[in-house]
Design a protein with these regions (language model features):
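Short gly/pro/ser/thr-enriched loop/turn and capping motifs at secondary-structure boundaries
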Residues: 107-109, 132-135
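Conserved alpha-helical substructure of the radical SAM core
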Residues: 1-124
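Glycine-rich S-adenosyl-L-methionine
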Residues: 140-154
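An acidic, carboxylate-rich microenvironment
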Residues: 57, 88, 136, 145-148
Length: 154
Protein backbone atom coordinates (compact mmCIF):
# COMPACT_ATOMS: atom_id res chain seq x y z
CA UNK A 1 0.00 0.00 0.00
CA UNK A 2 1.35 3.43 -0.87
CA UNK A 3 2.21 5.63 2.09
CA UNK A 4 0.09 8.51 0.73
CA UNK A 5 -3.03 6.36 0.70
CA UNK A 6 -2.28 4.97 4.14
CA UNK A 7 -1.92 8.51 5.47
CA UNK A 8 -5.26 9.42 3.86
CA UNK A 9 -6.95 6.43 5.54
CA UNK A 10 -5.46 7.28 8.94
CA UNK A 11 -6.39 10.95 8.64
CA UNK A 12 -9.96 10.03 7.68
CA UNK A 13 -10.24 7.74 10.69
CA UNK A 14 -8.84 10.42 13.00
CA UNK A 15 -11.23 13.10 11.67
CA UNK A 16 -14.22 10.78 12.09
CA UNK A 17 -13.08 9.50 15.51
CA UNK A 18 -13.17 5.85 14.49
CA UNK A 19 -10.81 2.95 14.99
CA UNK A 20 -8.74 2.91 11.82
CA UNK A 21 -7.85 -0.75 12.13
CA UNK A 22 -9.00 -3.94 13.74
CA UNK A 23 -7.45 -7.32 14.45
CA UNK A 24 -9.12 -10.71 14.33
CA UNK A 25 -7.10 -13.22 16.36
CA UNK A 26 -8.86 -16.32 15.08
CA UNK A 27 -7.02 -18.99 17.03
CA UNK A 28 -4.45 -19.63 19.74
CA UNK A 29 -3.30 -22.77 17.94
CA UNK A 30 -0.18 -23.06 15.78
CA UNK A 31 1.39 -25.82 13.72
CA UNK A 32 4.87 -24.82 14.92
CA UNK A 33 6.34 -24.71 18.38
CA UNK A 34 8.84 -21.87 18.20
CA UNK A 35 10.69 -21.43 21.48
CA UNK A 36 10.62 -17.62 21.24
CA UNK A 37 6.86 -17.37 20.58
CA UNK A 38 4.08 -16.74 23.08
CA UNK A 39 1.72 -19.11 21.20
CA UNK A 40 2.15 -22.57 22.68
CA UNK A 41 -1.08 -24.33 21.76
CA UNK A 42 -0.57 -27.20 19.32
CA UNK A 43 -2.63 -27.37 16.14
CA UNK A 44 -4.46 -30.45 17.47
CA UNK A 45 -5.02 -29.03 20.99
CA UNK A 46 -8.65 -29.99 21.69
CA UNK A 47 -9.04 -27.50 24.55
CA UNK A 48 -7.78 -24.59 22.42
CA UNK A 49 -10.03 -25.68 19.57
CA UNK A 50 -13.04 -25.82 21.89
CA UNK A 51 -12.33 -22.25 23.06
CA UNK A 52 -12.26 -20.81 19.55
CA UNK A 53 -15.11 -18.52 18.68
CA UNK A 54 -17.53 -19.78 16.01
CA UNK A 55 -17.66 -18.49 12.45
CA UNK A 56 -20.94 -16.65 13.11
CA UNK A 57 -19.26 -14.60 15.85
CA UNK A 58 -16.47 -13.49 13.51
CA UNK A 59 -18.90 -12.66 10.70
CA UNK A 60 -20.95 -10.52 13.08
CA UNK A 61 -17.79 -8.83 14.40
CA UNK A 62 -16.75 -8.03 10.82
CA UNK A 63 -20.17 -6.51 10.13
CA UNK A 64 -20.15 -4.46 13.34
CA UNK A 65 -16.63 -3.10 12.90
CA UNK A 66 -17.32 -2.13 9.30
CA UNK A 67 -20.56 -0.39 10.28
CA UNK A 68 -18.57 1.49 12.94
CA UNK A 69 -16.27 2.76 10.19
CA UNK A 70 -13.16 0.64 10.71
CA UNK A 71 -11.08 0.64 7.52
CA UNK A 72 -8.40 -2.05 7.80
CA UNK A 73 -8.39 -5.54 9.27
CA UNK A 74 -5.50 -7.80 10.28
CA UNK A 75 -6.22 -11.52 10.46
CA UNK A 76 -3.84 -13.32 12.79
CA UNK A 77 -3.56 -16.08 15.38
CA UNK A 78 -1.75 -18.44 16.32
CA UNK A 79 -1.76 -19.65 12.76
CA UNK A 80 -5.01 -18.43 11.16
CA UNK A 81 -4.75 -20.89 8.27
CA UNK A 82 -5.47 -23.70 10.74
CA UNK A 83 -9.10 -22.56 10.85
CA UNK A 84 -11.30 -24.55 8.48
CA UNK A 85 -13.38 -21.39 8.02
CA UNK A 86 -10.39 -19.14 7.33
CA UNK A 87 -11.41 -18.40 3.73
CA UNK A 88 -15.00 -17.66 4.73
CA UNK A 89 -13.85 -15.17 7.36
CA UNK A 90 -11.25 -13.64 5.05
CA UNK A 91 -13.78 -13.30 2.21
CA UNK A 92 -16.28 -11.63 4.57
CA UNK A 93 -13.61 -9.03 5.38
CA UNK A 94 -12.95 -8.42 1.68
CA UNK A 95 -16.66 -8.27 0.86
CA UNK A 96 -17.17 -5.74 3.67
CA UNK A 97 -14.59 -3.51 2.01
CA UNK A 98 -11.74 -3.83 4.51
CA UNK A 99 -8.13 -3.45 3.51
CA UNK A 100 -7.07 -6.90 4.75
CA UNK A 101 -3.64 -8.10 5.93
CA UNK A 102 -2.71 -11.57 7.20
CA UNK A 103 -0.08 -12.76 9.67
CA UNK A 104 1.04 -16.34 9.01
CA UNK A 105 4.12 -18.51 9.41
CA UNK A 106 3.71 -19.43 5.74
CA UNK A 107 4.10 -23.17 6.19
CA UNK A 108 0.45 -24.00 5.46
CA UNK A 109 0.10 -21.94 2.27
CA UNK A 110 -0.93 -24.25 -0.57
CA UNK A 111 -1.53 -23.70 -4.27
CA UNK A 112 -5.26 -23.29 -3.69
CA UNK A 113 -4.58 -20.60 -1.06
CA UNK A 114 -2.35 -18.71 -3.48
CA UNK A 115 -5.04 -18.93 -6.17
CA UNK A 116 -7.65 -17.69 -3.67
CA UNK A 117 -5.44 -14.74 -2.66
CA UNK A 118 -4.78 -13.96 -6.34
CA UNK A 119 -8.53 -13.71 -6.86
CA UNK A 120 -9.14 -11.75 -3.62
CA UNK A 121 -5.81 -10.08 -2.91
CA UNK A 122 -4.87 -8.98 0.59
CA UNK A 123 -3.07 -5.69 1.10
CA UNK A 124 -0.26 -7.62 2.76
CA UNK A 125 0.69 -11.13 3.83
CA UNK A 126 3.18 -10.98 6.70
CA UNK A 127 5.18 -14.21 6.79
CA UNK A 128 7.33 -14.88 9.85
CA UNK A 129 10.95 -15.30 8.82
CA UNK A 130 12.47 -15.59 12.26
CA UNK A 131 15.82 -17.01 11.27
CA UNK A 132 17.70 -17.54 8.04
CA UNK A 133 20.40 -19.87 9.39
CA UNK A 134 19.27 -23.48 9.14
CA UNK A 135 20.74 -24.76 12.41
CA UNK A 136 19.38 -21.86 14.45
CA UNK A 137 15.96 -22.15 12.81
CA UNK A 138 15.80 -25.87 13.60
CA UNK A 139 16.82 -25.19 17.19
CA UNK A 140 14.11 -22.54 17.62
CA UNK A 141 11.30 -24.06 15.59
CA UNK A 142 12.21 -27.72 15.56
CA UNK A 143 11.26 -27.63 11.87
CA UNK A 144 12.85 -26.81 8.55
CA UNK A 145 13.78 -23.25 7.66
CA UNK A 146 10.85 -21.50 5.96
CA UNK A 147 13.18 -20.54 3.11
CA UNK A 148 13.79 -24.23 2.49
CA UNK A 149 10.04 -24.64 2.10
CA UNK A 150 9.41 -21.57 -0.03
CA UNK A 151 7.79 -21.79 -3.42
CA UNK A 152 7.70 -19.19 -6.13
CA UNK A 153 4.50 -18.15 -7.84
CA UNK A 154 4.15 -16.03 -10.98
Amino acid sequence: MQSGYLQYVLNKAYRNKIAASGTLELTARCNLSCKMCYIHRAENDAEALAQELPTAFWLDMIRQTREAGTLTMLITGGEPLLRKDFREIYFACKKAGFLVSINTNGTLLRDEDIAFFAQYPPVRVNISLRRFRRNLCRALRDRKNVLTNRREYP
